[in-house]
């Protein structure tokens, strides 16, 4: 994959990464994760130079709310959003009744995060998080997210090879970080898996649950114009 292309790491760096990764494995085992699952998830894992490159060159700028709307909520996205709202109306209404979040808000967040599931990122989440944790700039944060990602695999929600997301580790159609997955993901179709990658009932219910647990008030509008 082109996303994995980059300059090879020096031999000593690769060796140091392997030693560091063993430390992660030891920590995960100490937290009760299955050793066989960990061995499979961590086998052959290497840092991804492209992830470091993207982390280093994040743009530093701010947008006004109007600029944000023009960039993110364009006419095309609004049109598709209306189509998706109609297409999944019955499912969305059932979820809305349970979580007290109107269907249009679930679809709107879905569209903003991943263009209705179209752009979810093409990076292997565990390798990306390991790269960022090893890099050192935000090591504590990303190491924690890596351990949680491994726990998600250990719980059987998804296999490590299918756990894809953004370069920063945001996963699935609603772009949850692993810790957010643990806090908000829902197995709405009751199949034993919280599948925010490919199961729309789980995707929508997880979005609604996230909003509800974050203090969403269904009796209030999302915002008001201010002078």
Region annotations inferred by a language model:
Residues 1-7:
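Bacterial N-terminal signal peptides
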Residues 7-14:
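Sec/Tat signal peptide C-region and signal peptidase I cleavage site
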Residues 14-32:
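N-terminal module-boundary/linker segments of secreted carbohydrate-active enzymes
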Residues 33-227:
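Catalytic glycan-binding domains that act on GlcNAc-containing polysaccharides
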């Amino acid at each position: 994959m082109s996303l994995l292309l980059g300059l090879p790491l020096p031999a000593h760096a690769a060796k140091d990464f392997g030693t560091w990764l063993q430390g992660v494995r030891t920590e995960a085992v100490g937290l009760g994760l299955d050793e066989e699952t960990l061995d499979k998830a961590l086998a052959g894992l290497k840092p991804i130079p492209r992830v470091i490159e993207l982390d280093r060159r994040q743009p530093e700028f701010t947008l006004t709310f109007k600029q944000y709307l023009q960039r993110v909520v364009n006419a095309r996205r609004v049109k598709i959003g209306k189509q998706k709202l109609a297409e999944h109306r019955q499912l969305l209404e059932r979820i809305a009744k349970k979580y007290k979040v109107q269907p249009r808000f679930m679809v709107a967040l879905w569209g903003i995060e991943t263009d209705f599931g179209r752009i979810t990122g093409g990076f292997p989440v565990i390798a990306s998080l390991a790269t960022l944790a090893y890099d050192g700039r935000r090591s504590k944060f990303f190491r924690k997210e890596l351990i949680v990602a491994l726990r998600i695999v250990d719980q059987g929600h998804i296999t490590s090879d299918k756990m894809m997301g953004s370069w920063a580790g945001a996963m699935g159609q609603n772009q949850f970080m692993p810790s957010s997955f643990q806090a908000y993901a829902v197995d709405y179709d009751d199949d034993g898996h919280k599948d925010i990658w490919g199961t729309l009932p789980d995707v929508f219910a997880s979005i609604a649950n996230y909003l509800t647990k974050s203090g969403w008030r269904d009796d209030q509008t999302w915002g008001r114009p201010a002078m």
